[in-house]
């Protein structure tokens, strides 16, 4: 079992000079606007108000960093979470979209401390064209990607497995790399943390 010892806000940034300057291993959370990134981070950390949750799409317009202290099997880890602005917000102006895109791509391409990217997909909606483009982009830049199918509490158990199989085909990924998750029911919390620690846990030990 993985225990969250502490979780705290670190800083907000819009460009590299505002990024944290230490060597903590980072995980970025990406997904379309209003897919539930903030709710997922709150569920993972067990802190209901760590990240502000809004029903208004496009609310997150900066890179927001949070530090999480974890323990697994007596070994402590520290991971920094980076909450990125959502993509695909239809009501945003072209100028805002261009600014957000530059902010996100600069971080994803140049951040040396970025160990993995969690790509969040709505299990009912499925991968949007923006989701697929982002996945291709991350793979082209050799980023480790963990795909999380969120809001699975909206599906029955009988519908969930076939839907995950369908998602794996649509995204051209093995079924085992797509993790089901529910912020409402806290389903998949240990599995996501476990997958992240298995991927780069040694670099996150403290």
From Swiss-Prot:
GO biological process: division septum assembly
GO molecular function, one term: GTP binding
Keyword flag ATP-binding: no
Pfam families: MMR_HSR1
Transmembrane segments: none
InterPro entries referenced in this protein's UniProt entry, alphabetically: G_ENGB_dom (IPR030393), GTP-bd (IPR006073), GTP-bd_ribosome_bio_YsxC (IPR019987), P-loop_NTPase (IPR027417)
Cofactor: Mg(2+)
Binding-site list for GTP: 31-38, 58-62, 83-86, 150-153, 181-183
Protein residues bound to Mg(2+): 38, 60
Domain EngB-type G stretches: 23-202
Coiled coil: none
One GO CC term, this protein: cytosol
Function according to Swiss-Prot or TrEMBL: Necessary for normal cell division and for the maintenance of normal septation.
Similarity comment text for this entry: Belongs to the TRAFAC class TrmE-Era-EngA-EngB-Septin-like GTPase superfamily. EngB GTPase family.
Protein name (Swiss-Prot/TrEMBL): Probable GTP-binding protein EngB
Protein source organism: Myxococcus xanthus (strain DK1622)
Gene name, Swiss-Prot/TrEMBL: engB
């Amino acid at each position: 079992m993985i225990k969250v010892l502490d979780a705290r806000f670190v800083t907000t940034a819009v460009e590299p000079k505002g990024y944290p300057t230490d060597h903590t291993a980072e995980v970025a959370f990406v997904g379309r606007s209003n897919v539930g990134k903030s709710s997922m981070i709150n569920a993972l950390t067990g802190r209901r108000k760590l990240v502000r949750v809004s029903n208004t799409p496009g609310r997150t317009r900066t890179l927001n960093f949070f530090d999480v202290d974890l323990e697994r099997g007596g070994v402590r880890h520290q991971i920094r979470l980076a909450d990125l602005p959502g993509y695909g917000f239809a009501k945003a102006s072209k100028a805002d979209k261009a600014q957000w895109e530059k902010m996100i791509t600069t971080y994803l391409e140049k951040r040396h401390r970025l160990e993995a990217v969690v790509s969040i997909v709505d299990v009912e909606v499925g991968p949007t064209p923006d989701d697929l483009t982002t996945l291709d982009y991350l793979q082209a830049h050799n980023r480790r990607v963990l795909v999380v199918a969120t809001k699975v509490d909206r599906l029955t158990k009988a519908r969930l497995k076939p839907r995950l199989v369908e998602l794996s085909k649509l995204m051209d990924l093995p079924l085992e790399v797509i993790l089901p998750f529910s912020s409402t029911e806290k389903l998949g919390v240990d599995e996501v943390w476990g997958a992240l620690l298995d991927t780069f846990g040694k670099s996150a030990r403290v």
